[in-house]
């Protein structure tokens, strides 16, 4: 119990160091509401409680909850040893696609870099965006679709978009893809166990990477999170790892 309390104090001191020292060193302002929010979130994460926090626009809540999550994992590991709890990923659910991308490509890389440089963490923070299979390419169906249009007078931009899926398995990354092509090449609701492409399937590889224990932060929209909850209630296979 003594060590747990000491680790908790140390975790809260690190919050102050991050927001009052490290962030200002990189040109960011000190925001008291942001710091208070991070302390509140960390307390509830470590206490395994539910917290409803009303955070106004512009206080920097994204960094507040990211820092709280990183320190939660670090100090739950130190305080509890190798319990399953600290190995669970954190799920961040947001309705904004732009924010999902920003968390993955801007917030997390910046936070990971400065915390590693400071010695707060020893390894990069790994994250992935999770979404439904209808957003991804089925390699077998893509191959069939490309063969089907070879002799057809297809719109040049749409054809180029379709062919580019050989390089991009996430269809949201490709412009000018027709709705029909998207439906024809997306991962089906049920994948065949004897699919000839299963061993090299990019969608299956994406799922494997997403389930890796080092993939700490799972980013999704609200519908995906609710769908995961529904799967669990119906005793279906969850969409997300236990979090």
Name each model feature, range by range.
Residues 28-45:
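N-terminal pre-P-loop "Q-motif" helix
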Residues 39-40, 63-71:
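Contiguous, well-ordered alpha-helical segments that form the cores/surfaces of helical PPI scaffolds
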Residues 47-67:
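Walker A/P-loop
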């Amino acid at each position: 119990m003594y060590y747990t309390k000491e680790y908790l104090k140390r975790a809260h001191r690190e919050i102050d160091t991050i927001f009052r020292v490290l962030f200002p060193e990189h040109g960011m302002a000190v925001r008291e509401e942001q710091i208070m929010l991070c302390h509140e979130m960390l307390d509830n994460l470590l206490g395994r409680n539910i917290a409803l926090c009303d955070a106004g626009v512009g206080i920097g809540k994204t960094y507040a909850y990211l820092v709280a999550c990183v320190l939660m994992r670090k100090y739950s590991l130190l305080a509890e040893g190798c319990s399953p709890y600290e190995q669970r990923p954190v799920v961040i659910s947001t309705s904004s696609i732009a924010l999902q991308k920003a968390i993955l490509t801007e917030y997390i890389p910046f936070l990971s870099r400065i915390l590693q440089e400071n010695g707060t963490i020893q390894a990069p923070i790994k994250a992935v965006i999770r979404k439904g299979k209808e957003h991804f390419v089925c390699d077998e169906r893509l191959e069939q679709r490309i063969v089907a249009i070879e002799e057809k007078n297809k719109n040049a931009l749409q054809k180029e978009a379709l062919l580019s899926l050989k390089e991009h398995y996430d269809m949201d990354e490709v412009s000018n893809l027709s709705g029909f092509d998207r439906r024809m090449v997306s991962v089906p609701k049920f994948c065949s166990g004897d699919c000839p492409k299963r061993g090299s399937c990019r969608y299956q590889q994406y799922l494997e990477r997403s389930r890796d224990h080092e993939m700490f932060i799972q980013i999704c929209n609200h519908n995906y999170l609710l769908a995961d909850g529904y799967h669990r209630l119906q005793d279906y296979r969850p969409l997300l790892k236990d979090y």
